[in-house]
A protein has these predicted regions:
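C-terminal cap of thioredoxin/glutaredoxin-like
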Residues: 3-6, 12-32, 102-105, 109, ...
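Structural alpha/beta surface segment adjacent to cysteine/selenocysteine redox centers
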Residues: 11, 17-118, 203, 207-214, ...
Length: 226
């Protein structure tokens, strides 16, 4: 029986792009079925304390540029750290990805064109004709999918993805969720690989030692609501 993994991401995310090919190769090696779940990062950030790039401290913004260059080299991807059409309204692109999933098709080939479209090829993914071209280019029925992407059912699926992400504490892009354990960021792919190779049980985020339990319950009961 195939194992599966939930993949929360957005096409606006450089980290999702940088890790996408490596992640997909990993899923092939481990025979994992991938549940592709595009999400709205502004909504996720608002609910989990994350900040959009322009709200972060300048030092953090500068460090991000260094990290993009490091990981560009590490993963061997083409990436412009200041792409022409970024940031952009990603809703149409993410909704199209949802529509592909809902149609029963695998969105991987589309994503392999769309991600570098933003970060390497200076394409505007907020433009519907660009999306049609990319989808057509990988053999998908682009016009039908574009119409489906505007449907109420796709909108509800997108909202459900967001709800599910929040329920499992997937608070950024990309997040890979294996048996309930969240691996946040493409720089955790090697840790995900280790978990899959070892076959260990999923780590939990609600376990504390007996001493920690005693300290919270008896010494600092005010921390129970923290």
């Amino acid at each position: 029986m195939h194992r599966s993994i939930d993949y929360y991401f957005s096409l606006v995310s450089p980290s999702a792009y940088i890790g996408h090919a490596t992640f997909m190769n990993l899923t092939q090696r481990h025979s994992l079925d991938v549940n592709f779940k595009p999400v709205s990062l502004p909504t996720i950030f608002a609910e989990t304390g994350g900040l959009p790039l322009n709200k972060r401290a300048p030092a953090r913004q500068r460090y991000r540029i260094m990290e993009l260059q490091r990981w560009r080299e590490k993963r061997g991807v083409r990436l412009n750290v200041h792409p022409k059409f970024w940031p952009f309204n990603v809703e149409a692109a993410d909704h199209l990805t949802v529509a592909i999933v809902e149609s029963g098709a695998n969105p991987n080939q589309f994503l392999r064109k769309a991600f570098p479209g933003v970060w390497a090829d200076e394409r505007n993914l907020a433009d519907e004709q660009t999306l049609v071209m990319l989808a057509d280019g990988v053999g998908l029925p682009a016009q039908k999918l574009l119409a489906d992407a505007k449907s109420e059912s796709v909108k509800k699926r997108y909202e459900k993805n967001i709800k599910e992400a929040l329920e499992v504490d997937a608070f950024g892009s990309p997040c890979y969720v294996l048996n309930g354990e969240v691996f946040w960021g493409q720089d955790r792919i090697e840790l995900l690989d280790d978990a899959l190779t070892s076959g260990r049980k999923a780590y939990r985020n609600d376990i504390c030692s007996s001493w920690e339990y005693f300290a919270i319950r008896c010494i600092h009961p005010d921390l129970q609501s923290a």
